[in-house]
């Protein structure tokens, strides 16, 4: 190092000067390399800092935008009642009065329709946004998430009724060209009536399964609400949802809860039921006969239904679901026992003859009780004796026709 620090003038020989210069060049190259590494490190730090700066600037803009949104005054919710032209519409605000307002350029003119909800600016009442349609939570609850799995093979003894309901509901949805070729309008709705437990609901679910349609199931009593207009609104939203989800089937079970004959109402509750019925009649009149929405009603009391509900144009086809005869009961027993492990001595025809006046639900209960007796005896199969024992218990312990109970009653 001492030699390298000497001045070039002190060098006495060319060799010493050469070594001195070589050492100086090597030192300068090493120093140059270190400076290059420092420059690369500084450039890398600069790029990182610039990236962080861009990220923080973006975050600042996002927070400023959120603050501006929070400072924005709330909008008024209104309903479009009439469309004057693409830039002006008549709206009814949530407070009640109507206004002729302008439409923001950000709103798509094709979304402007009468009855659609929208948001209005507080100052100018201009339409800022068109809101999506919404329905009551009860209406959404009427839609079955899982499609019905029941098929026509699960129904026994109703071959004629199956044919009639397929003609009235299934064919218009799957083969509308047949009706167009003949030149007739298919039935708008089908009413199923008959004693309890004869398979009315099962038949409606089977139709929905075969047509691959959305199944909207409700009970008439669910449409009866406490406050004025609530029941009519539920009916209106139910049929609007059915049109939106088309092809769909609206099934109203126990329709006599809202469809009873109108009389001089003595209470506000009776008047509200009549308002709901009138909304139902208006909704049924609004359907296209060849549309993808069908309505099926079911009742045990057709004798008390209002005549306006039964007239052609609403429930065009009225199908009776009677108590099964011997052949029908035999078919029902075959359906209920197809998954049971039966012994060879089981005679379902004899069981069918012994169950005169029983409906499908009661026959299912008899099959279940026969299986329970086999389990009690720890038998691997259900024999004829189990069926006869179940039939005797069903007949003796619970007299359904007279509603009499005795000790050891069986509730099937």
From Swiss-Prot:
Keywords: ATP-binding, Chaperone, Coiled coil, Cytoplasm, Nucleotide-binding, Proteasome. ATP binds at residues 197-202, 336. Residues 410-412 are annotated as: Docks into pockets in the proteasome alpha-ring to cause gate opening. GO terms for biological process: proteasomal protein catabolic process; protein unfolding. One of its GO terms (molecular function) is ATP hydrolysis activity. It is found in: Cytoplasm. Its main location: cytoplasm. Residues 18-72 form a coiled coil. InterPro entries: 26S_Proteasome_ATPase, AAA+_ATPase, AAA_lid_3, ATPase_AAA_core, ATPase_AAA_CS, NA-bd_OB-fold, Nucleotidase_PAN, P-loop_NTPase. GO terms for cellular component: cytoplasm; proteasome-activating nucleotidase complex. It holds the Pfam family AAA_lid_3. Homohexamer. The hexameric complex has a two-ring architecture resembling a top hat that caps the 20S proteasome core at one or both ends. Upon ATP-binding, the C-terminus of PAN interacts with the alpha-rings of the proteasome core by binding to the intersubunit pockets. ATPase which is responsible for recognizing, binding, unfolding and translocation of substrate proteins into the archaeal 20S proteasome core particle. Is essential for opening the gate of the 20S proteasome via an interaction with its C-terminus, thereby allowing substrate entry and access to the site of proteolysis. Thus, the C-termini of the proteasomal ATPase function like a 'key in a lock' to induce gate opening and therefore regulate proteolysis. PANTHER family: 26S PROTEASOME REGULATORY SUBUNIT (PTHR23073). Consists of three main regions, an N-terminal coiled-coil domain that may assist in substrate recognition, an interdomain involved in PAN hexamerization, and a C-terminal ATPase domain of the AAA type. Belongs to the AAA ATPase family. This is Proteasome-activating nucleotidase. The gene is pan.
């Amino acid at each position: 190092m001492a030699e390298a620090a000497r001045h070039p003038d002190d060098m006495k020989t060319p060799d010493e000067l050469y070594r001195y210069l070589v050492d100086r060049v090597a030192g300068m190259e090493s120093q140059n390399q270190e400076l290059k590494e420092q420059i690369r490190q500084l450039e890398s730090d600069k790029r990182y800092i610039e990236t962080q700066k861009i990220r923080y600037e973006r975050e600042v803009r996002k927070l400023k935008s959120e603050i501006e949104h929070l400072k924005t005054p709330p909008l008024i919710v209104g309903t479009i009642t009439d469309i004057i032209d693409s830039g002006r519409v008549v709206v009814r605000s949530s407070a009640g009065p109507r206004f002729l307002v302008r439409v923001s350029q950000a709103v798509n003119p094709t979304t402007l329709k009468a009855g659609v909800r929208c948001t209005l600016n507080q100052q100018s009442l201009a339409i800022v946004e068109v809101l999506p349609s919404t329905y009551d939570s009860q209406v959404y609850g009427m839609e079955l998430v899982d499609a019905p799995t029941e098929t026509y093979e699960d129904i026994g003894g109703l071959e004629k009724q199956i044919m009639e309901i397929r003609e009235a509901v299934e064919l218009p949805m799957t083969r509308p060209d047949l009706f167009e070729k003949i030149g007739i309008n298919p039935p708008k709705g089908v009413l199923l009536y008959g004693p309890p437990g004869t398979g009315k609901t099962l038949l409606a679910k089977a139709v929905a399964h075969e047509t691959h349609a959305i199944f909207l199931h409700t009970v008439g009593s669910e449409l009866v609400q406490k406050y004025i207009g609530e029941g009519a609104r539920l009916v209106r939203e139910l049929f609007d949802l059915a049109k939106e989800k088309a092809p769909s089937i609206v099934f109203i079970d126990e329709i006599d809860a809202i469809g009873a004959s109108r009389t001089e109402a003595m209470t506000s509750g009776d008047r509200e039921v009549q308002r709901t019925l009138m909304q139902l009649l208006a909704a049924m009149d609004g359907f296209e006969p060849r549309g993808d929405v069908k309505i099926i009603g079911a009742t045990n009391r057709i004798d008390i239904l209002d005549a306006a509900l039964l007239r052609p144009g609403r429930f065009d086809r009225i199908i009776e679901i009677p108590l099964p005869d011997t052949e029908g009961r035999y078919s029902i027993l075959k359906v209920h026992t197809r998954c049971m492990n039966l012994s060879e001595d089981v005679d379902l025809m004899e069981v069918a003859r012994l169950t005169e006046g029983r409906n499908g639900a009661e026959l299912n209960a008899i099959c279940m009780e026969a299986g329970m007796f086999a389990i009690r005896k720890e038998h691997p199969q259900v024999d004829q004796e189990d069926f006869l024992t179940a039939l005797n218990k069903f007949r003796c312990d619970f007299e359904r026709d007279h509603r009499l109970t005795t000790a050891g009653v069986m509730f099937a």
